[in-house]
Amino acid sequence: MTATLALTEDLIRRRSVTPADEGCQAILETRLKALGFDCEALVSGPDDFRVTNLWAVRRGTQGKDGKLLVFAGHTDVVPTGPLEQWHSDPFAPTHRDGKLYGRGAADMKTSIAGFVVAVEEFVKAHPAHAGSIAFLITSDEEGPAHDGTIKVVEALSARGERLDYCVIGEPTSVDTLGDMVKNGRRGSLSGKLTVKGIQCHIAYPHLGRNPIHEAAPALAELAAEVWDQGNEYFPPTSWQMSNIHGGTGATNVIPGHVTIDFNFRFSTASTPEGLKARVHAILDRHQLEYALDWTLGGEPFLTPRGELSDALSSAIEAETGVKTELSTTGGTSDGRFIAKICPQVIEFGPPNASIHKIDEHVEVRFIEPLKNVYRGVLERLVA
């Protein structure tokens, strides 16, 4: 068994459902301290949702004047779902048909193990490496993410720590290892819209005001609106409704209000402020009586082609023969926080088809090549 596979299995055995870490970071800290890393635990969150974060750094011979390459990842995993639907215990790493099964196998314990072992090999080969290496690990990525990476970023920013490159171990590949990496992500802006009416008997509509009827034309206009055209890196901004709630449950009552949940996934071609203003303008034009609460989940970030993307693309092709695709598709990630203090952020990991699903898995044949790609990035950027 390879060192990467052994560490992956050890991490999968830990029932680290958000925000629990269940000792994963202690395992990493032990191995990193043995390599000369300075390790710092940053614990945050309320008593009923304590989040464990790890910042570990090994300075190169150039010290703080040299480049700093960070690996960012999360030890937490999503809940298993119905255990009876799994073909094996999700926290007992199981091999079947050339695949390693377990919760977190793809998202993202294999990536964490791969980068740790890559660093172990790299430091052995280059004990006097020039650039610096760091790990930023959290147990709150799959949850609300209020006390995870964002807290570490705030602490690093406050002390003036400069990050030059960041590789996030998210599972970005699609059909085969290395066919896609993420060099950016769209922003997320959510709204909870409550349109007010007047409740009354459904047989006497003239005595009330139906908020569903009043909201419908405005919602249709919002759904049809072209928010932007996107750009060379991002598709056009998308506006989608996720929930509509109105009524008392009775079939003979016009409701007093209706609540609509919606979400923007927006590109760098739009801003949160601009999108908000346009939504309010449409609602006001329809003369609705409404309240609207906004939540900014994250702003878009983009890493143009440069040193990090070139190093990663080159390492992928050297190891796998695959020419990777730079993409900004998909949901949000902790990259939205890290990009505030790091100019080059790229996500790369194993195929993602099984993430968050029953029988999550990673193909064993991809585990060592993943580690080798990570080592290739280290060789190219901080040796």
Curated annotation (Swiss-Prot):
Binds 2 Zn(2+) or Co(2+) ions per subunit. GO terms for biological process: diaminopimelate biosynthetic process; L-arginine biosynthetic process; lysine biosynthetic process via diaminopimelate. Keywords: Amino-acid biosynthesis, Cobalt, Diaminopimelate biosynthesis, Hydrolase, Lysine biosynthesis, Metal-binding, Zinc. GO terms for molecular function: acetylornithine deacetylase activity; cobalt ion binding; succinyl-diaminopimelate desuccinylase activity; zinc ion binding. It catalyses: N-succinyl-(2S,6S)-2,6-diaminopimelate + H2O = (2S,6S)-2,6-diaminopimelate + succinate. Its cofactor is Zn(2+); Co(2+). The keyword Methyltransferase does not apply. It holds the Pfam family M20_dimer. Zn(2+) 1 binds at residues 74, 107, 170. Pathway: Amino-acid biosynthesis; L-lysine biosynthesis via DAP pathway; LL-2,6-diaminopimelate from (S)-tetrahydrodipicolinate (succinylase route): step 3/3. It is an enzyme of class 3 (hydrolase). Its EC number is 3.5.1.18. The active site is at 76, 141 (proton acceptor). Belongs to the peptidase M20A family. DapE subfamily. Homodimer. PANTHER family: ACETYLORNITHINE DEACETYLASE (PTHR43808), N-ACETYL-L-CITRULLINE DEACETYLASE (PTHR43808:SF31). Catalyzes the hydrolysis of N-succinyl-L,L-diaminopimelic acid (SDAP), forming succinate and LL-2,6-diaminopimelate (DAP), an intermediate involved in the bacterial biosynthesis of lysine and meso-diaminopimelic acid, an essential component of bacterial cell walls. This is Succinyl-diaminopimelate desuccinylase. It comes from Cupriavidus necator (strain ATCC 17699 / DSM 428 / KCTC 22496 / NCIMB 10442 / H16 / Stanier 337).
